[in-house]
Amino acid sequence: MTQVAKKILVTCALPYANGSIHLGHMLEHIQADVWVRYQRMRGHEVNFICADDAHGTPIMLKAQQLGITPEQMIGEMSQEHQTDFAGFNISYDNYHSTHSEENRQLSELIYTRLKENGFIKNRTISQLYDPEKGMFLPDRFVKGTCPKCKAPDQYGDNCEVCGATYSPTELIEPKSVVSGATPVMRDSEHFFFDLPSFSEMLQAWTRSGALQEQVANKMQEWFESGLQQWDISRDAPYFGFEIPNAPGKYFYVWLDAPIGYMGSFKNLCDKRGDSVSFDEYWKKDSTAELYHFIGKDIVYFHSLFWPAMLEGSNFRKPTNLFVHGYVTVNGAKMSKSRGTFIKASTWLNHFDADSLRYYYTAKLSSRIDDIDLNLEDFVQRVNADIVNKVVNLASRNAGFINKRFDGVLASELADPQLYKTFTDAAEVIGEAWESREFGKAIREIMALADLANRYVDEQAPWVVAKQEGRDADLQAICSMGINLFRVLMTYLKPVLPKLTERAEAFLNTELTWDGIQQPLLGHKVNPFKALYNRIDMKQVEALVEASKEEVKAAAAPVTGPLADDPIQETITFDDFAKVDLRVALIENAEFVEGSDKLLRLTLDLGGEKRNVFSGIRSAYPDPQALIGRHTIMVANLAPRKMRFGISEGMVMAAGPGGKDIFLLSPDAGAKPGHQVK
C-alpha cells in the first residue's frame, strides 16, 4: 500500500549535562530510534533531533566542585553523550545544546511574546536563602525533617518515605545541601507564567484523542485540582540565560529546556542552509508532525507548560507525546551497590548495541509500563531469537548456496504461498511499528522465523545434498530459506542496524520495505560470514563487576589542587570590588637577612614605590632573576609591620608552596599601575 510522504520532527527528552548516559536513558533513545528508522523505511521525511539540557543550579555547583567553568563541563559532557548515542547507533540528524545562541534567541522571543500577550506576571515571593553561599536554594538543595512523618534527611519538595509533598519552608530544621548552613528567608521578585489562562485550551487538547489514555487521565487529575501560575525565573548566581531587561534574573531551566527542541532544529536548518524548514515545522498552522518521546517523570512539563507556552507565543503545539516508563534491572531499581546502575559506555565494553536494542524493543508497547531488564532472560532471548531463529536461518542455507551453486539463488521460489504469508505480514508488522506496539511486532516476526525454520527442518537440505540428481531441489530449498531470512531482516531493520549492515553485505542488496514484494531470484549472494555471536552469563557477570568498580572509583577521594586547597566561601561582587589589584614592576629583589623564607621586593607602581616582603624564597633561589619582571600586587592591603620592616602590599602567586610556587605575571603590554579588572 502506497503511503503519502509525511514531514515528521521527532525529539527525545534532553539529557541533563551533569552526568553520564545510563541504561535508563537508553530505553527512550532506542524506542525513538526504532520508530524513526521505520518511518524512514516507509519514505517519510524525518528530522530526528536532541540536545543536552545544559542549564541550572546543579550544573553551576558541579562545575565549581570540579574547578572548571560550566561551559567547559557541559562541552565535555556533550562529547561523552554523543559518543554513547553513536555507540548505540541512535540516528540523530542533529545533537545540540540548550546553551546555544539559537536557544537564547528563541527563549527570549517566546518570553517576549508571552509578556506582550499578558501571560507573564510579577510578584514578590519569600524563599530560603543560603547566607554562606549567597544564593537562593532550589527545593532539591534543601534537606530537613519531613513535616508529615518526621523522617529525617528529606528534600525540600517531597518526602521519599511517606510520599508527602510540601514547601521547603515547611521542613523541620532545614539545612542547605550546598554549605550545610541553616537557610534564612529572603524576599525576591519573580516572574510567573500564567498557566491557568490556558486551562480550556489544554483540556480540549487532552480530549482530542491523540494522547495516551494514561496521560490524558493524569492531566484530568491536574485540571480538577486547579492549574497554578508557574515560576519561570531564578535569581543570580545561576547558570543560564538572563531574562531581558531584568538584571540578575535568569530563565528557570525548565523554560528554556523544551525550547531546546526548537533550538536544535534551528541549528540543523542553519547547517543545511535551509531558511524555510524551521517555520514550516514550527509555525502555528504547520502541517508537519511533531512528536516528543519522554519519560513519565516529565509529563507535567510537556503536557501543560510546553503546549501552553507554544500557544501563547504563536507557535504550533506537539502532535503527540509518546511516554514510556522506567527501567528496572533484575526486578529492582537500578543499584550502584549491586552493579546494576549501568552506564551506556560500560555496556558497550561488554555487549554490542543491537543486543540491548532488541531486548528493549521486544518488551516495549504503547503503554506507560516499566521495563525490566532481566539479565539472565536477556542472554536467553538474544541467543534464542537473534542467533538461533534468525541468523541460523541464513547460515544453515548459505553454505550450500555458496559451495554448490557459486552463490547464485534459484530462479523460482520453492514455496510461493509460504513467501506470500511472509510478505502479507508486512501490514500487521508495519502497523505495530507505527503504533509503537514493538513487542507485538517482535512476536509476529519471531512467529514467522519459527515458520521459516520449520520449513527448512521439513525440507532437510542436508539430506537432499547427499542425494543424486537433486541439485535443483537443494538450490530451491536453500534459496527459499535465504529469501525468508531476507524478509525477516527487513522487518527487523529498524531494530538491528549493525546486524542489518552485515546481512545486506551477505545478501548483496539493500533491504527495503517495498523490496520484499519481489523475491531474490537468480541473484548472486556473497560468501557467508558469521553474522552474530552468541552471548553468555560470563559477559553479564563482567558487566556487573565493571559497574561496581566504576562506583568505587567515583567514590574515591578526589586528588589534585582543588582537593588539597578547596575553593573558599563565596563572596559578593562588592566584596571583590574592594580589592585593588595593580600591575607592578619588580625594580629590585634581594634576600632578607635572618629569614630563609622571605624575599624583599621593591615594586614600581607607575609613580609610586612599594616595599613588599614575600615568602617565595624557596621558589626563587636567585632573586636577581626577578628584576625587570612584571607581577600583580594587592595595592590597597593595609601595611603590615614585620620584624624586618614594613610590608606595603602583597604580590600574587599560585601553587602549593615551598619550591612549587609561581609568581603571577600579566600579559605583554600591561604597564606598572594598570588596574586588574
Swiss-Prot record:
- Work out whether the entry's keyword set contains Acyltransferase: no
Q: Return the EC number.
A: 6.1.1.10
Arranged from A to Z, the UniProt key words for this protein are: Aminoacyl-tRNA synthetase, ATP-binding, Cytoplasm, Ligase, Metal-binding, Nucleotide-binding, Protein biosynthesis, RNA-binding, tRNA-binding, Zinc
Q: Which reaction does it catalyse?
A: tRNA(Met) + L-methionine + ATP = L-methionyl-tRNA(Met) + AMP + diphosphate
Q: Where is this motif: 'HIGH' region?
A: 15-25
State which residue ranges cross the membrane: none
What are the BP-aspect GO terms?
methionyl-tRNA aminoacylation
List where in the cell it is found: Cytoplasm
Q: Which residues form the tRNA-binding domain?
A: 575-677
Top-level enzyme category: ligase
> How is the co-factor bound, per the entry?
Binds 1 zinc ion per subunit.
Tell me which family the UniProt entry assigns to this protein: Belongs to the class-I aminoacyl-tRNA synthetase family. MetG type 1 subfamily.
* Entry function: Is required not only for elongation of protein synthesis but also for the initiation of all mRNA translation through initiator tRNA(fMet) aminoacylation.
The entry describes its oligomerization and partners as: Homodimer.
- Identify this protein by name: Methionine--tRNA ligase
Q: Organism, per UniProt?
A: Escherichia coli O127:H6 (strain E2348/69 / EPEC)
